């Protein structure tokens, strides 16, 4: 897989077809991204244009203290597959999980990308350990915070994918022995935060498209694009009518839960969580609450501490 050259519209569409993705599916995905951005169906061609442009910007994707779940969520999306849609149409010059290079060759690729004359956009996955000069988190013999600081200094823009890079994530949970922090807090830089554990790839793709077509989106006080994180999960939940009728499931295996009764008394954090999960779903198929699991509030800062216990006795 070639990550260094954008395919262009014709070649990109051929690649999609070869991977079993029809143009109809591709445009449907673009329409979903457009809708998530708060735009009408007429904006879908603009999304398609941004994703199949011949000359793509350089992207450096750093992994810090994390589980790689955000990458896994992104590369396992369907219709169209993210490798055919995104990874082949941007100049993804460094991404440890999927790049072919390893060891010194990988480090050389990172150095080359950071010194490129055309600049780059930085994607960060994972929190930053800060204690003892960041030595609790090392990659290639360098503290994660040192490498990220260097990359952030010249970046055209910084997108934090996942709650770990946005706010510190599970590494920051009490007692936080490594003094982990999110990128913005640790480095004092402005970031576009796409939180979630993992975040919906639609929100990540939408943020990328917005940056390429319209610039930095309007952000809330926590650095999240209001386009994707402007409404409470609760307000768009299909179980909301049952909440308003005070119809609560007494247990996860109850008939009431199967009938769609509200999961609030079982620990659902939808009433205090900003995200668009009920609207865009995961892989356009399902999302936790619809599947019978309470919202954990994973797109909120410090949710590992502030949203626990995740489950309550009904």
Swiss-Prot record:
This is Periplasmic [NiFe] hydrogenase small subunit. One of its GO terms (molecular function) is metal ion binding. Belongs to the [NiFe]/[NiFeSe] hydrogenase small subunit family. GO terms for biological process: anaerobic respiration. Predicted to be exported by the Tat system. The position of the signal peptide cleavage has been experimentally proven. It catalyses: 2 Fe(III)-[cytochrome c3] + H2 = 2 Fe(II)-[cytochrome c3] + 2 H(+). It is an enzyme of class 1 (oxidoreductase). Its main location: periplasm. Involved in hydrogen uptake for the anaerobic reduction of sulfate to hydrogen sulfide in an electron transport chain. Cytochrome c3 is the physiological electron acceptor. It comes from Solidesulfovibrio fructosivorans. Residues 1-49 form the signal peptide. [4Fe-4S] cluster 1 binds at residues 67, 70, 164, 197. Its EC number is 1.12.2.1. Keywords: 3Fe-4S, 4Fe-4S, Iron, Iron-sulfur, Metal-binding, Oxidoreductase, Periplasm, Signal. The gene is hydA. [4Fe-4S] cluster 2 binds at residues 234, 237, 262, 268. Binds 2 [4Fe-4S] clusters per subunit. The lineage of its organism: Bacteria, Pseudomonadati, Thermodesulfobacteriota, Desulfovibrionia, Desulfovibrionales. Its cofactor is [4Fe-4S] cluster; [3Fe-4S] cluster. One of its GO terms (cellular component) is membrane. Heterodimer of a large and a small subunit. InterPro entries: Cytochrome-c3_hydrogenase_C (IPR027394), NADH_UbQ_OxRdtase-like_20kDa (IPR006137), NiFe-Hase_small_C_sf (IPR037148), NiFe_Hase_small_N_sf (IPR037024), NiFe_hydrogenase_ssu (IPR001821), TAT_signal (IPR006311), TAT_signal_bac_arc (IPR019546). It is found in: Periplasm. It comes from the Bacteria. [3Fe-4S] cluster binds at residues 277, 295, 298.
